[in-house]
Design a protein with these regions (language model features):
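Transmembrane alpha-helical segments that form the membrane-embedded catalytic/substrate-channel core
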Residues: 54-64, 94-96, 140-152, 193-215
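Short acidic-hydrophobic sequence patches enriched in Asp/Glu that either
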Residues: 74-81, 94-97, 199
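Post-HEXXH active-site segment of zinc metalloproteases
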Residues: 74-88, 117-120
């Protein structure tokens, strides 16, 4: 029992270096994918680039989840800034809003007050289990074709913070990045990024929430 307690305590400690390295690897893969799109300038290549970007966006969201649990740094302000800047803000996710949503999920898991179940119930029977491979494949194709945008918007509405001040930094960040890319004739990067955000990111996100245990 003592060994288990020791292992649990070690896992509960912030892991800044591991988090930063994982974040850099994901952004490196995204940068390489974007370079491939620039180099080949081919629609088929763009399709696979969007798949890769969406997959790595999902990985960044998982790193953001760790940051929401304060697993990045003991300094909470530093923890939240890094989590937002490198993981959540580029995805359009607000950290305080997500944290409230997610912590309530842990507190009310499996009950009628569980916000994740509320979201799933709004799209019933899409999340009705068991979910066969054929149905999962059909949902994947639907998501890739950007036919689940409404569902993405529903989830975004669940994580909007109540305090207006919590919107300032993320909006300034997004506005600055968008302006810099457009001014440098890199609007195509925005197009690929946002298409991935509402298609392949959601496709991989759906797969995970359908196969992971509830908790």
């Amino acid at each position: 029992m003592n060994d288990i307690d020791t292992q649990l305590k070690s896992l509960q400690k912030p892991a800044s270096l591991r988090w930063v390295l994982a974040c850099l690897v994901n952004w490196g893969i995204i940068a390489f994918a974007l370079y491939c799109a620039y180099f080949f300038q081919n629609l088929l290549v763009d399709f696979f680039v969007i798949l890769v970007i969406g997959n790595r966006q999902h990985a960044l969201a998982l790193l953001g989840h760790e940051g929401a649990h304060y697993m990045l740094s003991a300094n909470r302000r530093w923890n939240d800034f890094l989590t937002g800047f490198f993981a959540f803000w580029p995805l359009g996710i607000n950290l305080p809003g997500y944290r409230k949503f997610h912590f309530l999920h842990h507190l009310k898991v499996g009950t009628k007050a569980d916000p994740e179940l509320l979201h799933k119930n709004m799209k019933f029977p899409d999340y009705d289990l068991p979910l066969g491979r054929l149905k999962m494949a059909m949902f994947f194709i639907k998501d890739i074709l950007c036919l689940s945008v409404y569902e993405v918007l529903i989830l975004i509405s669940f994580v909007i913070p109540k305090r207006k001040t919590d919107l300032i930094l993320p909006n300034v960040f997004l506005g600055s990045v968008i302006a810099l890319l457009i001014l440098n004739d890199l609007g195509w990067v925005l197009i690929l990024w946002f298409i991935a955000n509402i298609s392949s990111f959601w496709a991989f996100f759906r797969i995970r929430i359908n196969i992971e245990p509830i908790g």
